[in-house]
Structure formats: structure tokens, C-alpha cells
Amino acid sequence: MSAAEKIALYWAYPFVRYALVVGVLIALCASLLGVTLVLKRFSFIGDGLSHVAFGAMAVAAVLGLHNDMPLILGITVVCAILLLRTGQHAKIKGDAAIAMISVGALAIGYLLMNLFSTSSNLSGDVCSTLFGSTSILTLTETEVGLCVALSALVLLTFILFYNKIFAVTFDENFAKAVGIKVKFYNLLIAVMIAVVIVLAMNLVGSLLISALV
């Protein structure tokens, strides 16, 4: 069998195609938003929100929810908004607040999974959640479709509002002076980064998202 035939055989498996599509879309969204977050001095927000998402996933598991996406996305979006809106003005500044939320959410998530989990393989469940070790192989067509739709929405939003996001990122005072709604665009950035993090959990796990964002 030639190399070309081996490659063709490899790509014949649906999970390989699904992983490629989802991985490329998530990497593209994360790279665009990552630059914005670094310039806003929130470079560790990806790591913090990924741990928040892990805690939310543990809560969903305890509640026995079959579709945990709405709960995880909702909690992650709320935390992202709180961090971006209060991190610059609170007594505890950005990175310190992120570190506190990150450690707290991770500890609460693992505690809940230990106390209330009905799984016989808790360590395996935690490992796959943190590192995405099995999620790559189990992506369904529905999950891929959802990822494509949400990634396209994030990219389209970023492109349409790029100039205003650029202004808010570099100088919020200037943005306010020229009439840009700074609070709204900070909210928009928070929602977009939360969406990307929740989507990425299915592929790379909650711990490795910080390498992308």
C-alpha cells in the first residue's frame, strides 16, 4: 500500500475528519481572541475560564443533565463577564482574580465529582474531561455542526466589529471619547471567549485550552 493510499484510508474515518474540522475552527477563533485578551492584560483568562467550565461540567454531572452545554456555557459566560467588567476596577486585579476563580472552580468540580459521581471509573472521567483524551474519538455529527455554527458566528462577529474591538482593546478612554459603547464590546468579547472555551473542551479538554487562547 502506497503512502497516498494509507493517507486516504486514514481520512476515511469520520472521527479524523471531525477532529480536523473542529480543531481548525477552534484554533482560528482562539488565535484571534487571544491577541485581544493579551493586549487587555487578561492573558490567563482562558486558563481560568476552562477551570470554571470544568466546575460547571461537574455540577451538570451531579444534576444528571444529559445536555450539559447550556449550563456550562451560561456559567462560563457569566464568569467571563464578571472578570472582564470588574477585573480592572476591583481591589483584586485581573490575573489575581482569575487565579482565585481558576483554583476554586477546579477544586469544587473535583470535589463534586468525588462526592456525587455514579461512575465506576472516576479517574478516567476526570482525565478525559481535563485533557480531552477520549472526546476526540467520540465527536458526533451534531457536535461538529454546532461547533461549525458557533465558530462561524464568533468569526463573523469579530470581523464585523473589528474596528470597535480594536479601539476598546488598545485604549478604552479613547473609545469612550469617540462614542463607542465600551461596556457592550467588553461584554461581546467575554461572550465570544466563553463560547470558544466551551467548544474547545470537547476536543482538547479543560486544562489544555490555555495553550490555544
Where are the language model's segments positioned?
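Short hydrophobic alpha-helical membrane-embedded segments
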Residues: 23-27, 45-53, 73-77, 182-192, ...
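Membrane-interfacial amphipathic/re-entrant helices at transmembrane-helix boundaries
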Residues: 1-28
